[in-house]
Design a protein with these regions (language model features):
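A recurrent domain-boundary module in secreted/ectodomain proteins
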Residues: 1, 160-167
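Short beta-strand/loop segment at the start of cytosolic alpha/beta domains
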Residues: 2-34
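A structural signal for leucine-rich repeat
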Residues: 132-136, 155-159
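Short, well-ordered coil/turn elements that cap or connect secondary structure elements
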Residues: 12, 138, 159-162
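Consensus positions within tandem repeat domains that build extended binding/scaffold surfaces
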Residues: 60-62, 83-88, 106-111, 131-133
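Structural signature of tandem-repeat unit edges
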Residues: 21-24, 36-58, 68-81, 91-104, ...
């Protein structure tokens, strides 16, 4: 089974994954991109490859950088990390939903996504928002966060040099 580690595969001619762990107990993959420009991306919690079920735990750096058509992204609940520049410069991206287990959003992850106006963060365990992760997004962007997390997430967004925004 270990021979699958670092192997890449594409599901449904859309998203491409790289195997990061493959044992009897742990099977994980990282999303590394897509073969073509997509309008909407839903990153699932799990994918099946060769009759094995893998948890999707990460979005790699530069995975969806400069997608010209992308307007909406939904990130599954097993993803814990969004890599640096993952959605950098996606000029039409307007809505992002971040799954409940993301703990780390990389530097410049959504930098320059000028139409990004609505970000929903479902999780209560976000530990780090990288530098400029949400810089140069729409000026009136709204971040919807879990109850009791507004202050902590607001501080992280400020440290990350986020453009003007509202947290609710």
């Amino acid at each position: 089974m270990q021979s699958y580690v670092r192997k890449t595969f594409t599901i449904g001619k859309k998203l491409t994954y790289k195997v990061t762990a493959c044992s009897k107990k742990v099977k994980t993959v990282t999303v590394i991109g897509s073969k073509k420009q997509l309008k909407s991306i839903t990153i699932p919690a799990t994918v099946t490859y060769r009759k094995m079920k893998f948890k999707v735990t990460e979005i790699s750096k530069n995975a969806f950088k400069k997608q010209k058509k992308l307007t909406k992204v939904t990130i599954g609940n097993n993803v814990t990390k969004i890599g640096a520049n993952a959605f950098y410069g996606d000029k039409k991206l307007s809505k992002v939903t971040i799954g409940k287990n993301v703990t780390n959003i990389g530097a410049n992850a959504f930098y320059g996504d000028k139409k990004l106006s609505k970000v929903t963060i479902k999780g209560k365990n976000l530990k780090k928002i990288g530098k400029n992760a949400f810089k140069k997004i729409k000026k009136s962007a709204t971040f919807k966060v879990p109850k009791g997390k507004a202050k902590a997430y607001k501080n992280m967004l400020k440290k990350a040099k986020t453009s003007s925004y509202k947290v609710k």
